[in-house]
Amino acid sequence: MDNKVLVKELITVSILHRCHIMTDASQTGLYFGQPMMLEYILSHPDCTQRELAKALNISPASAATSLGRIEKSGFIARRQDEADSRKNRLSVTESGLKALEAFRAVCDTTDTQLLSGFGEDEREQLFSFLQRLHENLAQNISREDLRKTIKSGGKR
């Protein structure tokens, strides 16, 4: 089989997966990139905007824009740092936690649909194939190049 056919199918599956999640997740009030931010804030309570941006490999300006939208939706709260009034500490609100839980449920449903009809042996075999694909590509790229690509949204 031609490499291009295989790679095109792999990319198509990835796009369909993302499309299903983002379409179904729209009812949660969360949009692309926001769940990742909420997950980080939830696991790093009282983090700063700068810490969040650094951890997610995004610019502070991008973080500020996204956090503004998330805050407007009522999913996070900002609290001024007691030691440094220039910093704001971030926390997930109760409604943010509910939205995140709903988003996780959407992901679980989509993942179940994606892998329906696959037996345990097939899942293990698929995992093995995906690990090999990962290794094939990872060996020729530096961590810094990967970080830059992620930060630029894939644009070079």
PLM features: residue spans?
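Charged, amphipathic alpha-helical coiled-coil/dimerization segments
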Residues: 68-131, 135
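C-terminal regulatory/oligomerization modules of transcriptional regulators
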Residues: 121-156
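N-terminal helix-turn-helix DNA-binding core of bacterial DNA-binding proteins
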Residues: 15, 19-62, 145
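Membrane-interacting alpha-helical segments
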Residues: 3-4, 59-60, 88-92, 145-156
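Short, locally clustered residues in the helix-turn-helix/winged-helix DNA-binding domain
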Residues: 11, 39-43, 104, 131
